[in-house]
Amino acid sequence: AQMAAGNRNGLAQSIFQVGGNGGSAIGPLLAAVLVLPFGQHAIAWFALAAMLASATLFRVGTWYKGELHRFTKKAQAVNSRVAQFSKRKINIALALLVVLVFSKAFYMSSMTSYFTFFLIDKFGVTVRVSQLCLFAFLTAVAIGTVVGGHLGDRYGRKYIIWGSILGAAPFTLLLPYLNFPLTILTAIVIGLVISSAFSAILVYATELKPGRVGMVAGLFFGLSFGLGGIGSAFF
């Protein structure tokens, strides 16, 4: 994503992430439309989309191979700017970013796993309605990711990160005490706000560790998201 970004790393990162977020959002909708009426065997049709994605990924890999040398030079230029900071400061900053992503992943995993059960238990809605509500929340997450990436490039990533952290807190505290329409509306706002900083955090991390995209991806997509999922199981 960053190879194709030009000077808009935040937007490129957000577009990359919205693929996963968009898939997560469509999942509950497809479950309500296909799996509930037709059974689990309907999932087999999704293999066609996976085959198409594999073919697309092969083409992207060919392009990636040709661009790798140019991107390495760009990473070296970024590395010269980061060199003014000590290794200790860089590692502390990276650890803070990991904690931020972990907290967001923890909340997202909790909402994805339990939001439908919360709606069914508190408001007595059907499984189909609860899945559609989860779809609305996850769609807001996908939209917030793209908007946050664009705003981070335009106004600065630091402001987006702080706004995402502090902006979601009051809505999160209000969520258990609202009626059904306001609960859904508030969940959508939370999804928009809490996801807006994902791309900004990841771009910051790749700038702190230029040329170490694999390590950064492992820390933020693997470790943080994995720990967030494990943490949500205890609540």
Regions picked out by a protein language model, each given a short descriptive name:
Residues 1-5, 196-209:
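Intracellular juxtamembrane helix-capping segments at the cytosolic ends
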Residues 1-19:
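Cytoplasmic helix-loop-helix junction between adjacent transmembrane helices
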Residues 16-63:
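Helix-loop-helix hairpin linking two adjacent transmembrane segments in secondary transporters
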Residues 46, 59-83:
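Flexible cytoplasmic inter-helical loops of multi-pass small-molecule transporters
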Residues 145-156:
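Helix-to-loop junctions at the C-terminal end of transmembrane segments
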